[in-house]
């Protein structure tokens, strides 16, 4: 259950996220630099003031690494791609925190039909993505492909919660994980020289992903 303070921080997050998306759409560097570093700390405060704190340290870790990754990618946008790997590593650490939370919460583990279906879908999409990235012959091919596995982990982790709490929580977590994967797919396609989007779409899907993951975790727990 969310406290009134947690709800306020959730609403504040959505306002700041909207500001960042508008800043990206208008290509306003000042708005982007002001709003993006605020996103993960606000979500962290939302957890801090919520009444559900099951393994909260893992969520603090996920959002802290998300904050670090956001900062690295901000620097990357100004200095070229030398910060890209550091940003990607930070987000991978955050994904591991999310997956560990899902894994520890979902004990005893159950192999349900949604998990099996999700596994086969992840395998099919990952195989296609790897072929696409390898075809580009980009020098970051292997790190990008490995990162894709981290996205698979949080998708499957969200499905592990099936039957361990309210269905709404699982669906929110799953939607957040899928949006995270889509956001990172857009970034990856840009990195290999095949952009499909603009920065506003990346931030729209990313900010929603983080918000839905946290909301889903709070609901399911």
Predicted features and spans:
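Polytopic alpha-helical membrane-helix bundles and their juxtamembrane interface segments
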Residues: 1-221
């Amino acid at each position: 259950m969310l406290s009134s303070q947690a709800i306020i921080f959730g609403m504040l997050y959505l306002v700041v996220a909207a500001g960042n998306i508008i800043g990206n759409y208008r290509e306003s560097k000042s708005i982007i630099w002001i709003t993006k570093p605020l996103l993960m700390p606000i979500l962290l405060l939302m957890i801090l003031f919520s009444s559900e704190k099951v393994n909260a340290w893992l969520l603090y870790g996920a959002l802290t690494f998300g904050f670090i990754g956001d900062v690295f990618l901000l620097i990357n946008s100004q200095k070229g791609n030398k910060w890209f790997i550091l940003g990607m590593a930070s987000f991978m650490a955050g994904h591991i925190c999310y997956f560990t939370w899902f894994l520890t919460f979902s004990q005893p583990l159950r192999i349900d039909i949604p998990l099996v279906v999700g596994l086969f879908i992840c395998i099919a999409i990952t195989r296609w993505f790897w072929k696409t990235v390898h075809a580009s012959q980009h020098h970051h091919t292997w790190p990008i492909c490995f990162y894709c596995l981290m996205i698979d982990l949080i998708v499957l982790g969200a499905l592990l919660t099936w039957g361990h709490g309210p269905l709404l929580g699982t669906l929110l977590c799953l939607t957040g994980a899928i949006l995270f994967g889509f956001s990172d797919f857009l970034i990856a396609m840009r990195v290999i020289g095949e952009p499909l989007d603009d920065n506003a779409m990346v931030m729209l899907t990313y900010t929603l992903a983080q918000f839905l993951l946290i909301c889903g975790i709070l609901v399911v727990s």
